A protein has these predicted regions:
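Short loop/turn motifs at secondary-structure junctions and domain boundaries
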Residues: 37, 98-102
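Regulatory loop-to-helix N-cap segments in sensory/regulatory domains
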Residues: 123-141, 148-152
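A short, aliphatic-rich beta-strand micro-motif
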Residues: 104-111
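Regulatory sensory and allosteric helical modules in signal-transduction proteins
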Residues: 48-98
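Sensory-domain boundary capping and coupling elements
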Residues: 111-124
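Residues at secondary-structure transition points
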Residues: 3, 68, 72, 101, ...
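Short hydrophobic/aromatic beta-strand element in the GNAT-like acyltransferase core
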Residues: 42, 107, 119
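Intrinsically disordered, low-complexity terminal regulatory regions
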Residues: 1-57, 62, 140, 144-152
Length: 152
């Protein structure tokens, strides 16, 4: 993991706590990611309810509130339970353009008790912004969140 992500995950671990509400933890996580990672125009979370992703805490411009399973990059990550790292969202079949300035995107499923409970979604106005190193670092971000999230 790169030095940047090592520092970021250490900060995240200090900012979140299993005793706190999930929305508070996700809000601080979104703010930290948006502040510490460069060349982003959106960082946040969508949470699942009955095979639909609903907008959660985020940083950036206003966003799509509801995303159906299998639709767009986030819905595909939910449906396939896999990381989606998209170099150019305009070439992604069925891309949902919440912000026309977004050009690349990475989405990572978040699990609790073996189920996908949401996704971490990060957008950039730069084509090809997200590397394998970003994916590795963001997987660790998700692991930290999965350890402290308590679902009601």
């Amino acid at each position: 993991m790169t030095q940047q992500y090592q520092e970021l995950t250490e900060q995240l671990a200090a900012l979140v706590d299993a005793e706190w509400p999930m929305v508070s933890n996700l809000a601080n996580a979104a703010a930290l990611l948006y502040e510490r990672l460069d060349r982003l125009n959106w960082a946040g979370f969508y949470l699942t309810d009955n095979h639909v992703l609903w907008l959660g805490p985020f940083q950036g411009k206003t966003a799509c509130v509801r995303i159906a399973e299998g639709k767009g990059v986030c819905g595909t990550a939910l449906q396939t339970d896999s990381v989606q790292r998209v170099e150019d969202v305009h070439k992604f079949p069925g891309h949902i353009a919440c912000d026309a300035a977004s050009r690349s995107e990475i989405v990572l499923p978040i699990h609790k008790n073996g189920e996908v409970i949401g996704v971490l979604d990060i957008d950039s106005p730069e084509v090809g912004r997200f590397s394998a190193e970003d994916e590795e670092g963001l997987r660790e971000v998700v692991r930290i969140l999965e350890r402290i999230i308590v679902c009601s």
